[in-house]
């Protein structure tokens, strides 16, 4: 029997303590909220691990219109224009709010913000905090601010397991703790659970991030969008470390070059060269590796002895792997870094389920389209966290009726899913691989064991990917290498995806026979 935490009834429940979750809670204050986090506050979040900064058009030669144009170009036809225009327009205000919360951004000698350059940006507009340690330097003061705010309660070591419904409305959240399961009664829940990198062997995300928020929302009947678009960062440090360490795009922004084992600069003739959009660079590196080669970043001439001063975190990670980036080539490979798909929301973070908001990487707002522009993720997390808070503040708490019964849920474990997703749902895809993934994932989902929730999320990626018969953005198919003339986003519910998956099983068995 689960304990109902009646003393917390009526509080807004926020699941996750990355940038999106923290900004939601701080913006809602003094409205009573409770943050549910499986780890320590702000810990084990992609936000805290971010090396890149926040994209904001703060330079004299820049504008929101230019930032929007770069965002749309990277998004490859699938961006929601209204959402993208409004988010980039609010970037400067988000920087101001973060500074007000205690974040100290890097400045130049004149006292103005230092602006970095990253791939597919036409201007220097990346705002950093403590260089390539931006994520931690942003999350730390926000977590401190949350700890100082009396209206925010934090439940650490608490794993969200199921959303509870009263009809089709949110009624509460079932969570697992060391002491057993508990229920938080609430008609207003925000999911800020991060991405899906933990579904893959090679990822830069915390390994526990397997798309829990997507699984929660999907089981509650929420609309999902663009699940097929998984961004592989081109330059993860190729080492034995797990998760893989990131070698930020900013290193290429400062002039580092990509070369293969023959010292050939294979990106030289590509539009944008080393600073082409991430999907383009990831595919090029994957092709080099697929032919049996290796790929390296060469920062020796561009940075040399200045590398450690510019990128202290990356320098330390390289040295941990036995590489001196001032003298040595840095071995790199693509790794899952960001998910453009997720729970479909409007411009305020509202999902299709009444009482449920989703912000940050767990959401699919349409900002990123088919391929995220570098450093737009922290921007979206900050802006959408604030927006959702303002939207929620206008919604009165209702007395939802908790269901009498709820299924027993076991702790999730994505280990059985990782080899399937890594093999079949990688940088390059085809029909046989995707149907193979569906055939392997359905039994794990139906088994209702530890792999069920991770399998659900991977299954959604496979189904969405199988339906997109083109190559666009981060979704590249060897059997459909061309882009269709008309770009179209796709949404569906879990029930729809399961119907499609079950109908695909005979095909996959026939292919493997």
Where are these regions (language model features)?
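Short beta-strand to alpha-helix junction loop
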Residues: 79-92, 126-144, 155, 203-211, ...
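Short hydrophobic core segments
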Residues: 13-15, 184-193
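An anion/pyrophosphate-binding glycine-rich loop and adjacent beta-alpha core
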Residues: 216, 222-330, 382, 391-393, ...
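Glycine- and aromatic-enriched mobile tails/lids
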Residues: 1-11, 27, 40-42, 50-56, ...
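Conserved N-terminal glycine-rich FAD pyrophosphate-binding loop of Rossmann-like flavoproteins
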Residues: 39-72, 76, 242-245
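FAD-site-proximal beta/loop scaffold in flavoenzymes
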Residues: 162-172, 176-178, 323-367
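N-terminal Rossmann-like FAD-binding beta1-loop-alpha1 element of flavoenzymes
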Residues: 11-35
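Conserved redox-cofactor binding core of oxidoreductases
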Residues: 99-180, 192, 201, 236-238, ...
């Amino acid at each position: 029997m689960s304990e109902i935490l009646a003393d917390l009834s009526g509080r807004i429940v926020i699941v996750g303590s990355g940038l999106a979750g923290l900004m939601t809670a701080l913006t809602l204050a003094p409205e009573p909220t409770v943050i549910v986090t499986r780890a320590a506050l702000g810990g084990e979040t992609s936000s805290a691990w971010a090396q890149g900064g926040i994209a904001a058009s703060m330079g004299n030669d820049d504008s929101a219109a230019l930032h929007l144009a770069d965002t749309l170009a990277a998004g490859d036809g699938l961006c929601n224009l209204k959402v993208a225009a409004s988010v980039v327009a609010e970037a400067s205000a988000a920087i101001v709010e973060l500074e007000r919360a205690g974040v100290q951004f890097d400045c130049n000698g004149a006292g103005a913000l230092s602006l970095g350059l990253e791939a597919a940006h036409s201007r220097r507009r990346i705002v950093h905090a403590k260089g390539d340690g931006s994520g931690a330097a942003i999350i730390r003061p926000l977590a401190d601010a949350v700890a100082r705010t009396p209206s925010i309660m934090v439940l650490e070591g608490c794993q969200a397991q199921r959303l509870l419904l009263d009809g089709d409305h949110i009624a509460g959240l079932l969570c697992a703790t060391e002491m057993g399961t508990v229920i938080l009664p609430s008609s207003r829940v925000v999911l800020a659970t991060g991405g899906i990198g933990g579904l893959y062997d090679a990822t830069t995300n915390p390994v526990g991030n397997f798309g829990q928020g997507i699984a929660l929302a999907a089981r509650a009947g929420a609309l999902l969008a663009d699940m097929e678009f998984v961004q592989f960062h081109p330059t993860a440090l190729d080492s034995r470390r797990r998760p893989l360490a990131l070698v930020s795009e900013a290193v290429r922004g400062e002039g580092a070059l990509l070369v293969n084992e023959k010292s050939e600069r294979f990106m030289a003739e590509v539009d944008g060269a080393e600073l082409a959009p991430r999907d383009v660079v990831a595919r090029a590196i994957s092709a080099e590796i697929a032919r049996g080669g290796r790929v390296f970043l060469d920062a020796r001439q561009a940075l040399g002895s200045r590398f450690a001063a510019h990128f202290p975190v990356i320098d330390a990670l390289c040295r941990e792997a036995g590489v001196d980036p001032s003298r040595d080539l840095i071995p790199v490979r693509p790794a899952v870094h960001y998910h453009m798909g997720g729970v479909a929301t409007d411009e305020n973070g509202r999902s299709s389920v009444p009482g449920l908001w989703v912000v940050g990487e767990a959401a699919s707002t349409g900002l990123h389209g088919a391929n995220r522009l570098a450093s737009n993720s922290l921007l979206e997390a900050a802006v959408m966290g604030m927006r959702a808070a303002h939207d929620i503040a206008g919604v009165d708490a209702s007395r939802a009726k908790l269901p009498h019964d709820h299924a027993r849920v076991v702790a999730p474990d994505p280990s059985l899913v990782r080899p399937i997703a890594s093999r079949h749902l990688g940088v390059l895809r085809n029909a046989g691989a995707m149907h193979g993934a569906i055939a392997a994932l359905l039994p794990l989902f139906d088994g209702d064991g530890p792999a069920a929730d991770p399998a659900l999320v991977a299954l959604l990626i496979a189904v969405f990917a199988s339906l997109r018969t083109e190559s666009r953005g981060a979704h590249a198919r060897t059997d459909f290498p061309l882009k269709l003339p008309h770009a179209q986003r796709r949404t569906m519910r879990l029930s729809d995806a399961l119907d499609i998956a079950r109908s695909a099983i005979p095909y996959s068995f026939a292919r493997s026979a």
